Amino acid sequence: MALQSPGATGASSSVSRLLSSAKLSSTKTIFSVDFVRSYCISKGTKRRNELSGFRGYSPLLKSSLRSPFSVKAILNSDRAAGDASSSFSDLKPQVAYLEDIISERGACGVGFIANLENKATHKIVNDALIALGCMEHRGGCGSDNTSGDGSGLMTSIPWDLFNEWAEKQGIASFDRTHTGVGMLFLPRDDNIRKEAKKVITSIFEKEGLEVLGWRDVPVEASIVGHNAKQTMPNTEQVFVRIVKDDKVDDVERELYICRKLIERAVASESWASELYFSSLSNQTIVYKGMLRSEVLGLFYPDLQNDLYKSPFAIYHRRFSTNTSPRWHLAQPMRFLGHNGEINTIQGNLNWMTSREASLRSPVWHGRENDIRPISNPKASDSANLDSAAELLIRSGRTPEESLMILVPEAYKNHPTLMIKYPEAVDFYDYYKGQMEPWDGPALVLFSDGKTVGACLDRNGLRPARYWRTSDNVVYVASEVGVLPMDESKVTMKGRLGPGMMISVDLENGQVYENTEVKKRVASYNPYGKWVSENLRNLKPSNYLSSAILETDETLRRQQAFGYSSEDVQMVIESMAAQGKEPTFCMGDDTPVAVLSQKPHMLYDYFKQRFAQVTNPAIDPLREGLVMSLEVNIGKRGNILEVGPQNVSQVVLSGPVLNERELEGLLGDPLLKSQILPTFFDIRRGIEGSLKKGLLKLCEAADEAVRNGSQVLVLSDRSDNPEPTRPAIPMLLAVGAVHQHLIQNGLRMSASIIADTAQCFSTHHFACLIGYGASAICPHLALETCRQWRLSNKTVNMMRNGKMPTVTMEQAQKNYRKAVNTGLLKVLSKMGISLFSSYCGAQIFEIYGLGNEVVEFSFRGSASQIGGLTLDELARETLTFWVRAFSEDTAKRLENFGFIQFRPGGEYHGNNPEMSKLLHKAVREKSETAYAVYQQHLANRPITVFRDLLEFKSDRNPIPVGKVEPASSIVERFCTGGMSLGAISRETHETIAIAMNRLGGKSNSGEGGEDPIRWKPLTDVVDGYSSTLPHLKGLRNGDTATSAIKQVASGRFGVTPTFLVNADQLEIKVAQGAKPGEGGQLPGKKVSAYIARLRNSKPGVPLISPPPHHDIYSIEDLAQLIFDLHQVNPKAKVSVKLVSETGIGTVASGVAKANADIIQISGYDGGTGASPISSIKHAGGPWELGLAETQKTLIGNGLRERVIIRVDGGFKSGVDVLIAAAMGADEYGFGTLAMIATGCIMARICHTNNCPVGVASQREELRARFPGLPGDLVNFFLYIAEEVRGILAQLGYEKLDDIIGRTDLLKARDISLVKTHLDLSYLLSSVGLPKRSSTSIRKQEVHSNGPVLDDTLLQDPEIMDAIENEKTVHKTMSIYNVDRSVCGRIAGVIAKKYGDTGFAGQLNLTFTGSAGQSFACFLTPGMNIRLVGEANDYVGKGMAGGEVVILPVESTGFRPEDATIVGNTCLYGATGGLLFVRGKAGERFAVRNSLAQAVVEGTGDHCCEYMTGGCVVILGKVGRNVAAGMTGGLAYILDEDNTLLPKMNKEIVKIQRVTSPVGQTQLKSLIQAHVEKTGSSKGAMIVEEWDKYLAMFWQLVPPSEEDTPEANSDHILKTTTGDEEQVSSTLAEK
C-alpha cells in the first residue's frame, strides 16, 4: 500500500460546503473542530503517514547542575527566601554540546489573531483553532501517524472560565491584577507528582506568594497518539496570589523568579524533565501538547468552552525533524512562537552562558543569581530564543525591543534605511557589540499579553502574510486562506519582508508597522550620541612595504609551523596574486588527518559544518548585502544595563589584521591590551608539557582580564624561536583561553586576538574565529606574501607578462581580500550572515581528537571517534618544530602532497597506479587484472575509516554458487549525479547506457536531459548509431536515459516532461565535495547543446544558488517532495544529503517529509570545481553519517519507510559490503565510474581542458573520449562478483541478510601511527528494520493522498479535452490546503504530449486562496485563472500556459498596494505567462529561464539568477534587484526614482527603454496584463504611455545587449550627479 504524504487532503467539495457554512453558522468551537477534521480527513481518507520517534543515544550533559535548591533542601529547609540565593560560582556554566543541540530541529506553521479593541471573545480562540487546522500540512506527525509533533495556543488568561471553576471550588473570584496562573506539565506518577507540587508550593510560599488552588486541566486522552501517550504528562494549573507588588511588570518578575527557583530546585532529580511550566503569568496562558492541529481543541475541552475568551491568540503547529514525544517542546513557548531554525544556536548558548556573570539590573533587587541559568542546552533552539527574550522582557525591555536586539534586521548596505529611520541604525550599531544575533530562518510571533506582534529574520526566509479587517481585527499567518473571510471587510493585505516587524498594541488599540515600531523603540535612548562618542573605528593601515625576515629565516619558520610547498604556492601565493581562493577539482581522496602517516596541522582535524534542509545556505556573492565581517573589539557590557559605557569598543571592518593595525590596537589606552606568548617548554620532556603550557596560558589570561585588560593577544611571534620552546598550536591556545574565561565568568570582559604564524588558509581563520578569536594577524602568511612579491621568479613572470603586475601593497591586500571572501563563504555555508554570530559558535566537528583535547579547548564540539591526547598532539606539533631546527634543515619546503598526487607524498586513493590497474581490468575484461586491482586496494595505507573494519561471521562459508546472482546485486548500484556540462556528453551518455544495461541507475546531475535519450536505440550497426553518432560500443536496445533525474538548486532543464520521464527524482540538497555551496557552469562550457538543454544561450554563465530557494526548512522540503510526487506519482523521490554530525536528525525529518530515498554522501565525493578549502575541510565521512542515520531512523520507527543510499569514494566490493552491514540498501559510485569509462585523474576538470574529453566541452578533446559502455558494465559486474565472494565466505546467500548487521563487523587489529580510535560508534546497533531491504526497495512510491487534481482528472470533460486536445472551461473553489494544484494535470499532459505538443486548451478558474505551488509545472495549453490570492511558489517550473491572479472585486484595499502572491514565484520556469494584479513577495522570478510576467510590485531579490524570459514590474521593488541575472530582460517602473540604489550591478546594466522593439515588448505585456486582470494601474500606464515610459528602466545582462529589445548605445552610465539626484529624492521622501 502506498504511504500518504504530509497534508494529504480530500476533494474540495466538502471544504467548500464547510467554508460556506462557516460564514453563517454560530462560532461554537465544536464546529471548528469538525471543520478542521473535515478539512484534513474528508472522504474518509487516512491520516498521512508521517513518522517519527526518538533519538535515544544523545549523551547527557557532561556536567549536571546541582543547586542548593534541591527538592530535599526545599522541603526540609526553613530558611527565608532572602537567603535562598547562590553566588555565580555555585552555578557552573552549562556547556552547549553539539549532540544535544542537533537532536531537535524543526519548522512550523504559525499565526496570530488580535482584536484592536482589546475585546476578549471566544471567536478569537475559535478562529485560531480553525486557522491552526488549516496549517496541518505544515506540521509533522510521529511514526504512529497520530502523534503530532506539537501544536498549541497562547491567549490571555480566560478569567471567566477560571472564576466559574473557582466558584465551584469555594474559592473567591480571582483578583486579576494580583493573580498568577501556571500551566504545568507534571509527572504522571502520583507520588512523584505530589512531591513536585510540594516543591512548587514551598517555593511560592517562601517567596511570599499564596497558593490559591490547583486545577486538573480537563483533557480527552483517548485522542492522543500512541507515541505521545507514552510520555503524556499530567496537566494542571496552579493559581497564586502576589501580595507585595502592584505593577504588572513587577508581578511578572516575581512569577519569573519563582519559576526559575523551581526549575533549579528539581534540576538534579530524575523526574526533572517531567516538570515543565508551559506558562506562569498574570497576563498569558499557553495550551499545547504533542498533538495534531485538529485535535488540540478536542484534547483541551477548555478551548471549546464559550467562557474561554481572549482578545488575541497565537497559534503554532510544529514540524520537528526528530520527534520523540516531548510535550514541552510544542509551541508557543512562554513568549514566542517560532517558525524556523536558529543555526547559530551553539554560539548563542555559549555567549549567553558567558554573559550570565555580568547580568545586573536594578529591577531584580539583587536577585540576579536566582534567575540563572538563563538558557538550557538540552532544550530546542526555539525554547532558548524564548528564554533569551524572556530575560530581556522581564528586565524591562518591551517585546519589540527585545526582538530587535536578538533578531536584528540587515541594516548595513540598506539603500533607504538611513532615510527612513536613521535612529534605528544607531540602535543596531549600539547593540551589535553587545548581543550576537540569533541568526537563521525565523518568523517569530510574540506577546506579553499587552502587545502581540511578529518579526521576520534578516533574510526573509519564512513566509509571513498579514491582513486587517474593517471590524478591527489583525491577522498574521504563515499562509493566507487559513480562515474563511469576507473579502469586502479586508482593508489591508501585506507581508513581512526581510527584517520587518508588525506590532499590535492591545492596550491602546494601535497597529504599528515596521518603520513605526523601529522608530519608537530606537527613541527610548540617545543611541546615536552614545555610538558617536564611544564607538571607535580602526582605520586601515598600510601594509609593510618590505620583508622583515631573511629568506632562510622565513623558510625555517614556515617549516616550524607546518607549511608545505603546496600551501605556499597553491594557497598563499595564489591568493596574493589573484585575490581569491584557489579552485581545484575531483574531491579529497587523501586520508583524514588522524589516519594520515604524515604530520598535520591541528586545523586539519576539524571539518566545517554546513546547512542542509532545516535551514538554507546563503549566496555570499549575490546576497552579500545581508552579510558582514565587522567585529567589535573590547569588553561587552551588561546586556541588562543601557548606557554609553557599553559601546566603548573598537570596530574592525573585518577580522584579518596586518601588523600595523595590530600595533594600533595594542596602543589603544582604553583597551589595555595584554600580549600572552603561546609557547610550551619541553626541556623536562614531552609528557605533560603541552598541558602545563596551556594551564599557564589560561592562568595568565585570567589574571590579565581581572586586572582590566579588554584585549588578550595570544602570540606565537618571537624574535628568536627556541628549539625547546615550541609554539602551542594557535587553535588549541585560543580554544583553551576561550573556554577558561567562559567557565570563570570572564569571557564578556575581553576579546581574544590571535597573532600567529600558523594561519594562512580560509579554514584556519574560520577555526580560530569559531573557537573564540575576534581577530587574527597572520604575520607569517603576510611575510610569505612579501617574500613572494620580492622573489626573482615573481618579478620575472610579471616582467614577461605571465602574471598580472601587483605591488607589494596589492599582494597583501589581495591576500586579505581572498581570506575575507573565503570567510564569507564559510559563514554562508551554515546560513550565517554575520561574523558576530559565527565567532565562538564552534560550528565544526572533529575527527581524530580525544576527549582530553576536546574538553580542554573545544568543549561542546562533537568528536565521535576519539583520537589524539594532548601528549600525542604535542608530538605531532614537534614533528614540524624539530625539522626546522635540525642541522640538516631542508633548503626548500617539503611537498606533502596533500592536494596533488606526487610520488612519495601523501597517499591518494585515486592514484595513477590504481587507475591503470582498473583500466586494464575493465578494458581487457580480465578477472586476473581485477584481482591485481583488488590486491592493490588491500595493500593500500589506511585511508578511510572503513579501512579500520573487517568482517567476522557467525556462519560457515558456503559455495559462491548459492549466493544471489550478480545481476541482482548490480540493481543496487547507482552512479553519482554528474551534470552534463561539468562532464562531456560522451561520458554522460556512456555511463547512462551502461547502467541501463545492468539494471542499475545513472543520475542526470543538474542540467536536464535530451529527449532523444529516452527511447531505445534501434539503429545500431557495428557498435555505432546515427541517433548517438558520437558514441561507440553500442547495442540495439540500449537507452541513454538517466533513471535518476536530478532537481538541483538551479533547476536547469527541469521541465514537466523531464520530470515525468524519470524513474526516480533526486533533490540534491548538498554535494560531498562542497556542501553548503552552489555552483557555476562557466560560459566557456555552455555550448549550444548545453544551452538548449538548460533553456539558455551559448556562452552565458549559469549559476546554481547555494540553497534551493523553495527549501528553507523541513516543511519546505516536504512541499517540494509533494510537488514532485504530484507531477510524477510513479517516481520515487530521493533527497541527497552530505554526512555531518546531526545528519540522523535531518534524515528523520526527511523521512517524515515523505521522501522515498535518503542518500548520504561522504566528503570524498568528486566535483568539477570547488575551492580547495571546501574540498579539504567540509563534509564528513559517510561511515559516521550512515551509522547515525541508521540508528536514528530505527530509533524513530522510520527505517522501513525509506531506502538508504550511500556514496563517496566507493572502490570495491568490500566498500559495498561494509556499507550494507552498516545499514545501506543501495550504493553509489562516482569517481570510479568515470575512471572506468576513461578518466585518467588529470585533475584539471575545472579548466575545460580534460585531455581525454571526460570533463570538457571542447569538441577536439571530446573526440578523444576512450570509454565504452561495456567497460563500466565490466567494472560493476566485477564489483558484484567480489560482493558474492565475500558473502559466500561469510556464509550468507543474499545481500539482504547482512544489511544493518554491524555485528558482522569488527575493528581490525592494527596500529595507527598517531593514536588509537574508538570505533564503537560505527559498530553499535539499535536493532534492525522490521522488513527486509528488498521489501523496502520494492515498496510503492509514497503517495500524496487524494488531491484536488485527482478530482479534476476524474471530470469526463477535462479528460476528454486532454485525450483529444479539445477546449474546456471549468470553475471551482480552492483553499490553502489545496497544494500543487494543476501539477498532476500537467504531468499527465507532459507524459502524453511532451513540453510543447498539447494543442488543446484547459481553461480552469479557481476562486479563493490557493495553497503552495499553485500552477506548478504547467504545460502549454493550460490557462489558469485565480480570483483571490495565492501562497508561495506560484508557477514553479512552469513550461508554458498562462496564469492570471487577481483579487476579488469587492475588496476594501487597492490591489496594487496588496500582496496577492507569496515568495519565490516562477522558480525555474521555462516558459509561459504570469499576470498578477497586486504585489509579490521575495525572489520573484528567481532562476526564471523563459517565462514572461507582469506584477505590480515585489520584495527583495527579484529576477535573481534569471537566464531568460521577461519580467515587467509596475511598482516598487525591494533590494538586490537582478543579482546573478545572466539572461533575460526586466522592465521596472520607477515612479519615485528609488530603483538605482536597490540594484545589484555586478552583472546587469540599466538603461531607459529606448529601443522601439523593447518599447513594443513592454507595452504589449502591460496591455495583456490589463486585459487579463483588469488592472487599474496598468490601464493608467497605457493611457498615459509617454509619461510612464520615461519612468521605466530596462535591466540588461551582457547576453542581451545585442538583442533588438535592448540598444546598447543607450546604456546608462551612472554619474555622480545621478547618484546625488537619487539621494536627494530619497531624502525628500
From Swiss-Prot:
GO terms for molecular function: 3 iron, 4 sulfur cluster binding; glutamate synthase (ferredoxin) activity; metal ion binding. It comes from Arabidopsis thaliana. Disruption phenotype: No visible phenotype. The glutamate and glutamine levels were unaffected. PANTHER family: FAD NADPH DEHYDROGENASE/OXIDOREDUCTASE, FERREDOXIN-DEPENDENT GLUTAMATE SYNTHASE 2, CHLOROPLASTIC. CDD domains: gltB_C, GltS, GltS_FMN. Pathway: Amino-acid biosynthesis; L-glutamate biosynthesis via GLT pathway; L-glutamate from 2-oxoglutarate and L-glutamine (ferredoxin route): step 1/1; Energy metabolism; nitrogen metabolism. It is an enzyme of class 1 (oxidoreductase). Its cofactor is [3Fe-4S] cluster; FAD; FMN. FMN binds at residues 1186-1243. Residues 1599-1629 are annotated as: Disordered. [3Fe-4S] cluster binds at C1239, C1245, C1250. Binds 1 [3Fe-4S] cluster. Gene3D superfamilies: Aldolase class I (3.20.20.70), Glutamate synthase, alpha subunit, C-terminal domain (2.160.20.60), Glutamine Phosphoribosylpyrophosphate, subunit 1, domain 1 (3.60.20.10). Its main location: plastid. One of its GO terms (cellular component) is chloroplast stroma. Belongs to the glutamate synthase family. Residues 108-507 form the Glutamine amidotransferase type-2 domain. It is found in: Plastid, Chloroplast stroma. It catalyses: 2 oxidized [2Fe-2S]-[ferredoxin] + 2 L-glutamate = L-glutamine + 2 reduced [2Fe-2S]-[ferredoxin] + 2-oxoglutarate + 2 H(+). Residues 1-107 form a transit peptide. Its EC number is 1.4.7.1. This is Ferredoxin-dependent glutamate synthase 2, chloroplastic. GO terms for biological process: L-glutamate biosynthetic process. Keywords: 3Fe-4S, Amino-acid biosynthesis, Chloroplast, FAD, Flavoprotein, FMN, Glutamate biosynthesis, Glutamine amidotransferase, Iron, Iron-sulfur, Metal-binding, Oxidoreductase, Plastid, Transit peptide. Expressed predominantly in roots and slightly in leaves. Low expression in the leaf mesophyll and phloem companion cell-sieve element complex. The gene is GLU2.
